[in-house]
Amino acid sequence: MERLTSPPRLMIVSDLDHTMVDHHDPENLSLLRFNSLWEHAYRHDSLLVFSTGRSPTLYKELRKEKPLLTPDITIMSVGTEITYGNSMVPDHGWVEALNNKWDLGIVKQEASNFPELKLQAETEQRPHKVSFYVEKSKAQEVTKELSQRFLKRGLDVKIIYSGGMDLDILPQGAGKGQALAYLLKKLKTEGKLPVNTLACGDSGNDAELFSIPDVYGVMVSNAQEELLKWHAENAKDNPKVIHAKERCAGGIIQAIGHFKLGPNLSPRDVSDFLEIKVENVNPGHEVVKFFLFYERWRRGEVENSEAYTASLKASVHPGGVFVHPSGTEKSLRDTIDELRKYHGDKQGKKFRVWADQVLATDTTPGTWIVKLDKWEQDGDERRCCTTTVKFTSKEGEGLVWEHVQQTWSKETMVKDDSSWII
């Protein structure tokens, strides 16, 4: 959050499974649409928050499976853990707040008296969360009796049932809603209260997100029965909460447009990259647009036309240099020429490209340095390059690519880098 010196224009707080991530979309198209929109229009002045019921272990597994962006803040284990940035630094103030009237030993002891409760995997048992599976028909009765037992033992806990089978026991002060309220209070104290906040969810454990004052909310079209029921009983007359017509990340994009929170046209929704126009000079957008074109070129989804090559060359400095991850230097214009022979080589294959953490710095008047992680998925193999791009600009002439340098990220183990083009 340190990169922002003023209040974020927008803070998106989104659940992951079946909200940001559509597990019924093998190509991850809606997620990739959101990624392109966020990196080109929001990353530089907004905050992305993932709020998931997953433990850190399962969250990291999901990151390996899906093309998720790197969030600024991660809320895990149903609002009981808050971490910041790439390195996921824990919020110790939140940990202290959750210790009030909470005793993990007593919680486990009382829950063991209910044979209906089946303990979830060890990775899902956290310092402030105990998780079980329970049949839907028995959930209400078990929840009621458990609550009474905890009250008699002097504990102040909450029980959340979601997904038609998950039962989580947390401190009363925990949960996705309380974690969001805590974050908003913290940001306000720092003078960085977001101009707008959009909460996004699909299941019962997301309901609390929509109860926070002055927060917009979207239930994606595939929202579960328990969340729709909560909405009907508690928020049906609230114009700030909508039930989207689109699934998952598509519903989030729809909500951005519905509430007029900012741009809602993803670069992936524009069929011809030459038609993508931006009112102001935006180096981050140029990078997102180029790598989207690169993906479409190799998938054979754009015509093998001289117009595209000419357009690319016109945006590159005649002396522009590309430093390959192997350390080899070559001309940027030669790299564009080389790209021509790869047209359609990934047609019909699972080949996707996305940019993450796109951050542009205006170093001197007319010069920008853009840093990002460029990801490439080819079948089941994923590779990432830390990429630095230098742009220059002359008034009225747009941006010119001067220098591109790539190095393999820590997550990427490469035996042969000859197949990496740019």
Swiss-Prot record:
<comment type="subunit">
    <text>Homodimer.</text>
</comment>
<comment type="pathway">
    <text>Glycan biosynthesis; sucrose biosynthesis; sucrose from D-fructose 6-phosphate and UDP-alpha-D-glucose: step 2/2.</text>
</comment>
<dbReference type="GO" id="GO:0005986">
    <property type="term" value="P:sucrose biosynthetic process"/>
</dbReference>
<dbReference type="InterPro" id="IPR023214">
    <property type="entry name" value="HAD_sf"/>
</dbReference>
<protein>
    <recommendedName>
        <fullName>Probable sucrose-phosphatase 2</fullName>
        <ecNumber>3.1.3.24</ecNumber>
    </recommendedName>
</protein>
<dbReference type="InterPro" id="IPR032710">
    <property type="entry name" value="NTF2-like_dom_sf"/>
</dbReference>
<keyword id="KW-0378">Hydrolase</keyword>
<comment type="similarity">
    <text>Belongs to the sucrose phosphatase family.</text>
</comment>
<dbReference type="GO" id="GO:0005783">
    <property type="term" value="C:endoplasmic reticulum"/>
</dbReference>
<dbReference type="InterPro" id="IPR006379">
    <property type="entry name" value="HAD-SF_hydro_IIB"/>
</dbReference>
<dbReference type="Pfam" id="PF05116">
    <property type="entry name" value="S6PP"/>
</dbReference>
<dbReference type="GO" id="GO:0000287">
    <property type="term" value="F:magnesium ion binding"/>
</dbReference>
<dbReference type="GO" id="GO:0009506">
    <property type="term" value="C:plasmodesma"/>
</dbReference>
<dbReference type="InterPro" id="IPR006380">
    <property type="entry name" value="SPP-like_dom"/>
</dbReference>
<dbReference type="InterPro" id="IPR013679">
    <property type="entry name" value="SPP_C"/>
</dbReference>
<dbReference type="GO" id="GO:0005737">
    <property type="term" value="C:cytoplasm"/>
</dbReference>
<keyword id="KW-0460">Magnesium</keyword>
<dbReference type="InterPro" id="IPR051518">
    <property type="entry name" value="Sucrose_Phosphatase"/>
</dbReference>
<dbReference type="GO" id="GO:0050307">
    <property type="term" value="F:sucrose-phosphate phosphatase activity"/>
</dbReference>
<comment type="function">
    <text>Catalyzes the final step of sucrose synthesis.</text>
</comment>
<dbReference type="GO" id="GO:0005634">
    <property type="term" value="C:nucleus"/>
</dbReference>
<dbReference type="Pfam" id="PF08472">
    <property type="entry name" value="S6PP_C"/>
</dbReference>
<dbReference type="GO" id="GO:0005829">
    <property type="term" value="C:cytosol"/>
</dbReference>
<dbReference type="InterPro" id="IPR036412">
    <property type="entry name" value="HAD-like_sf"/>
</dbReference>
<dbReference type="InterPro" id="IPR012847">
    <property type="entry name" value="Sucrose_phosphatase_pln/cyn"/>
</dbReference>
